[in-house]
Amino acid sequence: MVLLHVLFEHAVGYALLALKEVEEISLLQPQVEESVLNLGKFHNIVRLVAFCPFASSQVALENANAVSEGVVHEDLRLLLETHLPSKKKRVLLGVGDPKIGAAIQEELGYNCQTGGVIAEILRGVRLHFHNLVKGLTDLSACKAQLGLGHSYSRTKVKFNVNRVDNMIIQSISLLDQLDKDINTFSMRVREWYGYHFPELVKIINDNATYCRLAQFIGNRRELNEDKLEKLEELTMDGAKAKAILDASRSSMGMDISAIDLINIESFSSRVVSLSEYRQSLHTYLRSKMSQVAPSLSALIGEAVGARLIAHAGSLTNLAKYPASTVQILGAEKALFRALKTRGNTPKYGLIFHSTFIGRAAAKNKGRISRYLANKCSIASRIDCFSEVPTSVFGEKLREQVEERLSFYETGEIPRKNLDVMKEAMVQAEEAAAEITRKLEKQEKKRLKKEKKRLAALALASSENSSSTPEECEETSEKPKKKKKQKPQEVPQENGMEDPSISFSKPKKKKSFSKEELMSSDPEETAGSTSIPKKKKSSPKGETVNDPEEAGHRSGSKKKRKFSKEEPVSSGPEEAAGKSSSKKKKKFHKASQED
């Protein structure tokens, strides 16, 4: 009997599943295929032994990287050693990736199997995984997979500012396309403007200069001595400017209308702008090549080096190529044609555009191309894998190529490669130290600026926080100053006031309108407007010793006076009662008279 266990890697953790014991694994194939889509049947065949969840997304990313690289992570090792049986010979572990299976078999000693029934079982586990693990939903599993996928891709697609070879690939491709377009458009301008001024084609050879002159001259009959200075500025040659002026006076070209001249000038301006953009793009390419591949640029030139990188796909791919591949890079058609026809294979590809092969004699072109390809391969590897790329090695390699050329021509023996590389190493260390010193200086300046900025922000925030409570205190003090002390109403017993309480000012009674009186509750209004009873006046001869009592008495007098002057508002029921009593009195008087 064989104990079959299956390892399933998920974004949320590792799952170890066990299958029912069978004599042969192949007997499980039809049962598994039938039960993959049915959860109930699948549970009868497969059961979950253990589930090891990842503690965080960072741990999940580490485990995913380990599985992709074929390395047994500590979490996976702990799971397998804990939950697999101790008798390793009877255990068969099914895995989805052969690399991780080989690593488990080598490190832990378990027999691993991939493919066949294992693939079908993993398909079913992947389909029903959220049902096998308690507490895991399909939505949470999908979110975990999405997050891990983004993190894994982010680590794979690394962005390094110093090795932006993709920008070089796009720049050289655009530069080649611009060269073709400018050449085509310039020929169109020459043909179009040649009907009006055919002599200008023979005088001016440069396409960009010809387009500028066509835009400036326009109608040749309007060209005179006043424009000679501007012609000299455009052509940068006084003799050519004088020849253009003389040719315009005796030209054999046809007359042209104003609308045709407008179209020619417009098209010429477009060609001029394209040529200017081409120059700026070339400057940009040179700066990028000096940052990314300085040694290759110093050896073979920026344009040829960029074409090699573009053809290889990246600087890393170019560094991985052998020198024989670099030699014929760009001549694949000729190579396969030669292999098909059993003819001579090409000696050089893109490196033919370098100056070295053109300077070599015909019999030495193959030798120098092979030597140059060897040095290009070395330079690309130095640029790709050095921490601080410098142009020192490229310059030394260029000197070696020059010495080899002179050796082919004159027989002068070049220096040994060992001596040249020792010298280059010393200079490269000095250059790297200088570059690191500059970088550290820039970093210190940046940190100093950042520190100043943070200090300014902290100072501003502290000022704001200190000014805020002061403003709050001011705003809280202002209403206290404005607020007047209102006298409190004291309950009266038998119409007598408490003599211990004094009022600084009498409380003004609120005047009510008729509508408010009608809408308010009569009982409340009656209760609120209670008339104080009159007090017995003190004898004239009596003096008051206590000042507080005297103040209280004066206050109570004012209050009684105020209550007499103010009309007492009564409710509608009291008013109705008074009117009815008056009517009764009148009726009683009339009955007595009768």
From Swiss-Prot:
UniProt signal peptide: none
Chain residue numbers at which the record places covalent cross-link Glycyl lysine isopeptide (Lys-Gly) (interchain with G-Cter in SUMO2): K87, K230, K240, K540, K564
Phosphoserine modified-residue sites: S314, S466, S467, S511, S519, S520, S537, S563, S569, S570, S579, S581
InterPro entries (UniProt xref): Nop56/Nop58, NOP58/56_N, Nop_C, Nop_dom, Nop_dom_sf, NOSIC
MF (Gene Ontology): snoRNA binding
Transmembrane segments: none
Compositionally skewed regions (Low complexity) per UniProt: 457-469
Localisation: Nucleus, Nucleolus; Cytoplasm; Nucleus, Nucleoplasm
Basic residues compositional bias, start-end: 580-594
Subunit structure: Part of a large pre-ribosomal ribonucleoprotein (RNP) complex, that consists of at least 62 ribosomal proteins, 45 nonribosomal proteins and both pre-rRNA and mature rRNA species. Within this complex directly interacts with TCOF1 in an RNA-independent manner. Core component of box C/D small nucleolar ribonucleoprotein (snoRNP) particles; the core proteins SNU13, NOP56, NOP58 and FBL or FBLL1 assemble stepwise onto the snoRNA. Interacts with NOP1 and NOP58. Interacts with NUFIP1, RUVBL1 and RUVBL2; RUVBL1:RUVBL2 seem to bridge the association of NOP56 with NUFIP1.
Task performed by this protein: Involved in the early to middle stages of 60S ribosomal subunit biogenesis. Required for the biogenesis of box C/D snoRNAs such U3, U8 and U14 snoRNAs. Part of the small subunit (SSU) processome, first precursor of the small eukaryotic ribosomal subunit. During the assembly of the SSU processome in the nucleolus, many ribosome biogenesis factors, an RNA chaperone and ribosomal proteins associate with the nascent pre-rRNA and work in concert to generate RNA folding, modifications, rearrangements and cleavage as well as targeted degradation of pre-ribosomal RNA by the RNA exosome.
Protein name: Nucleolar protein 56
Organism: Pongo abelii (Sumatran orangutan)
Gene: NOP56
